[in-house]
Amino acid sequence: MLELDLQLASDGQHPDEAQLRRWCELALRQRTADSELTIRLVDEEEGRELNRTWRHKDYATNVLSFPAEIPDGILDIPLLGDLVICVPVLEREAAEQGKTLEAHWAHLVIHGCLHLLGYDHIEEDEALEMEELERQLLAELGHPDPYAGDE
């Protein structure tokens, strides 16, 4: 079971909670434990402030992942972590990259959830593993390869 806390702090258009939940559940299906996570949708000002505070980068980014560092078993429902999605950045990227909003939303939610599971893309081999998993999950949803233009 996934307990999802959706926080809306942006006026931008966004998928409904059921759609966000579907993408999260797909990305998290390898996890057998119940999970709780928060998705906070923010504007550029808050996105920039969070990115500056936590990553020391002075710009708004598309998605930030904050994994919980609480061992399973302490809480009734294991807290997986928080995703912060900057809606204006997501919308701008989708337009610039020629992607549908739905496909880009799905990609960033899945990407963020994989980070909460411990996947990363700092080292090339880890990036290849994470990107391949993203491709597979998005293909299940009928969305194209989000990295097709990067090669």
Swiss-Prot record:
NCBIfam families: rRNA maturation RNase YbeY. PANTHER family: ENDORIBONUCLEASE YBEY, CHLOROPLASTIC. Its cofactor is Zn(2+). InterPro entries: MetalPrtase_cat_dom_sf_prd, YbeY, YbeY_CS. GO terms for cellular component: cytoplasm. The lineage of its organism: Bacteria, Pseudomonadati, Pseudomonadota, Gammaproteobacteria, Pseudomonadales. GO terms for molecular function: metalloendopeptidase activity; RNA endonuclease activity; zinc ion binding. Keywords: Cytoplasm, Endonuclease, Hydrolase, Metal-binding, Nuclease, Ribosome biogenesis, rRNA processing, Zinc. Zn(2+) binds at H111, H115, H121. Single strand-specific metallo-endoribonuclease involved in late-stage 70S ribosome quality control and in maturation of the 3' terminus of the 16S rRNA. Belongs to the endoribonuclease YbeY family. One of its GO terms (biological process) is rRNA processing. It is found in: Cytoplasm. This is Endoribonuclease YbeY. It is an enzyme of class 3 (hydrolase). Binds 1 zinc ion.
